[in-house]
Curated annotation (Swiss-Prot):
It comes from the Bacteria. This is Biosynthetic arginine decarboxylase. It comes from Vibrio cholerae serotype O1 (strain ATCC 39315 / El Tor Inaba N16961). Gene3D superfamilies: 1.10.287.3440, 1.20.58.930, Alanine racemase (3.20.20.10), Lyase, Ornithine Decarboxylase, Chain A, domain 1 (2.40.37.10). Its cofactor is Mg(2+); pyridoxal 5'-phosphate. It is an enzyme of class 4 (lyase).
Amino acid sequence: MRYDVEQPSKLDRVRADYNVHYWSQGFFGIDDQGEVYVSPRKDKAHQTQLSSIVKQLEARDLNLPVLVRFPQILHQRVHNICDAFNQAIEEYDYPNKYLLVYPIKVNQQKEVVDEILASQAELEHKQLGLEAGSKPELLAVLAMAQQASSVIVCNGYKDREYIRLALIGEKLGHKVFIVLEKLSELDLVLKEAKSLGVKPRLGLRIRLASQGAGKWQSSGGEKSKFGLAASQVLTVINRLKAENQLEALQLVHFHLGSQMANIRDVRNGVNEAVRFYCELRELGAHIDFFDVGGGLAVDYDGTRSQSSNSMNYGLHEYARNIVSTVSDVCNLYGQPRPVIISESGRSITAHHAVLITNVIGTEAYSPEEIPAPGADAPMLLKNMWRGFEEVQHGTDDRALIEIYNDTQSDLSEAHSQFATGVLNLEHRAWAEQLSLRIYHELRQKMSNKNRFHRPILDELQERLADKFFVNFSLFQSLPDAWGIDQVFPVLPLSGLEEMNDRRAVMLDITCDSDGAVEQYVEGQGIESTLPVPAWTSDKPYLMGFFLVGAYQEILGDMHNLFGDTHSAVVNINDNGESEIAFINEGDTVEDMMRYVHIDVDKIRTNYRQLVSQRVAKEEQETVLAELELGLSGYTYLEDF
């Protein structure tokens, strides 16, 4: 019997190419019109095209680039994480509760923190707390924590002022855990607590031997910057006993590192840390809270793997591993199960923000007819032409590789001969154009099925890729892509029903060769170029940079004085319509100048003097108005 297998549609292949289903967690997708949509509640009722949101923003006189926030996604992520732990607690009959603590360092923007807190505003028993890692963050958190469970975790190195602020938080009715990162902090806490008449709540950050893998592995292990070694932990216990303050120790904390890709590393770290908890309980410490820190990963590339940009587990598996490990070890020791805390800031915030901007121009290679070299042409050029004829008229797979290598060598020799005066400028230009044409022909003839061709094809894709000049600063909006090779999903927002027959690289508008996106999610892997529909100058070409809600804004720098982009908070109503709730305008040129201590008033004075001296009187007002418009304008490109 014959069965007909339904072939995937073109749009299904496009969806697979960009791997949207997996990295987006259902919050984004590609509809049947080839448009990228957002669905904050993961249903069709609350689904709208991102390009339609751009039109709304433009109607409000907001130029691209714009960082678009979807607060409903923040609400959904908080619910998903809490629900995963609550289910695990029920599944393992765990006799205590879970608390999700948001470290505001991940994204301190007020509208972000407010929405995270609002996600549980209607709940009687809230499962949210806040974490601060510095004095400024603590001051911000003290004013917000009453909207959550009033639990505050204080991490980071601390001075007298930081500690006094934390203790004052107790006077304000908060439950403030001062986590000791080094031994010297203990004396300071005890001294200031006595001075203020406050009973401190202490936590210990344990320096584990367990260590994860990836970009942040140095956060864990014996060489970690933070935490107390086993001998130091015992010193703290003995000191607290001597001061009759052992009851102040209420929390054990550890942190293996951000973006833990392998669930086995998570389980090993929890197993080691919960033994610290049990041992400390046996020494008389009445610890009730077990803080596993951060580490819950985001699947940036959607491959569900152990790569540093992914994770080989799901949210429910993460929760089950932590709850079951804590429960099993406590059973062995006969100790009560503690309240479990996680500081899962990246997982809460990454999905909620998308940077949307426009392509302002391209540089693309198109094959062109190249004349054969003349009889008196240098021998090097004639050799190159023979290679071109070979690849045109067909040859075997092995010869294709030889032609590629010969072309590489010949082009290098052409550059050398130009530098020594053997070849002139026309010769060099001809050699470069012919080599591109040969590369183009080789790309058509080589196959990914041939493993010897694959590395060459990758190189050819890069050489022949279109260059998309995109209106943004990599250093401001995607600093982790530059600094630590973090992968962020990138794709066009419209026209995906068309042929994705071009490949491109994204280049920003800074005057820096590092301002380029070098890694792209494609299918189940990472590539150096991205499949895209062809760019045309007669219609806008929108690009979206996804999963940028964690760390990117606060880490972004001001290279070339490109400042913060505009941002907009957008909700999707029950009719699938987008509603702009809030707009925060980005930096102007004047803002950036003042930030680097340039006296803008003096600049204006100098302008006026120069204009009065050099410009005709009837033009002076117009010229000064142009200069003033430049100072008040957006730092990104507006007219092109």
